[in-house]
Regions:
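Long, low-complexity intrinsically disordered regions
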Residues: 1-291, 296-299, 303-368
Length: 368
């Protein structure tokens, strides 16, 4: 048996770009992109839509329809953070991961009196939704009218709790595409996938949904470590390792420090991981999975520059400039009379060739 390949940081970055589907976007549906990644972090919805569009040949074509048809939904499956998830996996994800978020927010729920108000909040929300999908603000208003609010943060935690117990989810896009309307899960999402949440389907009792997620995560993000996968889903490392025992379609590699990483074997094919296109320039939106999908970003981002992608450590990640598989700067846009203009903030001197490549990437950004 041959030893696992040893990859440089550059090779890891290039392989990750290929795994993410950013190098050669395929002709797939929007929900296929979300499914391949496992989930897409989406507290910034417009950025998440760009993340999906960049990973498919059709760009933004049909993207709205995938939400309006109920094929992609948004909820809080893990880490108390909004994500896009395939609708068919919604119940299973929440069955496995939801209790961890409930436990982590228990103290705040007690202070706000969430549990004693939850049944009334559910009843009033579902009554309002009989008239069709509603903006979150409308549900906040009916809760206010019912005397369920009054404390800052109570509306958010009631909404979170009703998403975590699979009563509600965020479904169709609003007219401006910057938010979603709330819908009842029972009406919006087919009752499928629940069997995947039942423990005991794989060796060691790992729930099938966890085994399936670990495989998707590593194929869609790898090379990545067990620690990366564990942190991203807030699952114990032991659960990730158990899922790996039966995972097909992933192989082990090592970085130069000898740390074990896992990835899809096809991202390692050819003369260089990811191929020549992976060495090009990419403009990624804020909170993109290429950045947020890892606990350890040091393979693609110099630690000295880490603070520059999230200034002040406030949790608000900036759009990133990627070149040669490395995060080499951030970017933004300004409005001019003639249209939008790209503004680059490289961490170090950027060659004229890469600047021109960034301009071309800017011109190709999906229109939403």
């Amino acid at each position: 048996m041959s030893s696992p390949a040893v990859l440089t940081d550059r090779e890891i970055g290039l392989a990750r770009l290929a795994a993410h589907g950013l190098v050669r976007p395929e002709d797939v549906a929007p929900e296929d992109v979300v499914r391949a990644l496992g989930a897409v972090q989406a507290q910034d919805l417009p950025g998440a839509l760009v993340s999906v569009a960049l990973r498919r040949a059709g760009g933004s074509d049909g993207l709205r329809q995938s939400f309006d048809d109920g094929r992609i939904v948004r909820t809080w499956p893990m880490r108390g953070t909004l994500h896009l998830v395939p609708a068919e996996d919604l119940r299973a994800w929440l069955a496995v991961l939801g209790p961890r978020t409930v436990a982590s927010t228990a103290a705040r729920r007690r202070v706000l009196g969430i549990d004693e108000r939850l049944d009334a909040a559910r009843e009033t929300a579902l009554a309002a939704l009989r008239r069709g999908p509603q903006p979150r603000e409308r549900l906040h208003a009916v809760w206010e009218e019912a005397g369920l609010l009054g404390e800052p943060g109570r509306a958010y935690h009631l909404m979170l709790a009703l998403h975590l117990d699979a009563t509600l989810c965020l479904g169709p896009l609003t007219a401006d595409g910057r938010d979603q309307l709330v819908v009842p899960v029972a009406d919006w999402v087919p009752a499928a996938g629940e069997e995947a949440a039942v423990p005991g389907g794989t060796a060691g009792g790992t729930p099938p949904v966890v085994a399936r997620w670990v495989r998707r995560y590593l194929r869609g993000h790898g090379p990545a470590s067990v620690a990366d996968a564990s942190r991203w889903a807030a699952l114990p490392r032991s659960a990730v390792r158990a899922a790996l025992k039966g995972a097909d379609g992933v192989v082990a590699v090592h970085d130069r420090a000898g740390r074990e990483l896992w990835c899809a074997p096809e991202v390692l094919e050819g003369p260089a991981p990811g191929g020549r296109r992976a060495a090009g320039v990419f403009l990624l939106p804020p909170f993109d999975e290429y950045v947020l999908g890892y606990g350890d970003r040091s393979h693609v981002l110099a630690p000295a520059h880490a603070a520059r992608i999230v200034p002040g450590g406030n949790g608000v990640f900036k759009p990133t400039l990627v070149a040669g598989g490395r995060i080499v700067g951030t970017w933004g846009r300004v409005r001019r009379a003639g249209g939008a203009e790209l503004v680059l903030d490289p961490f170090e001197e950027l060659s004229a060739t890469r600047r021109k490549a960034a301009e071309r990437a800017f011109a190709r950004l999906p229109a939403l």
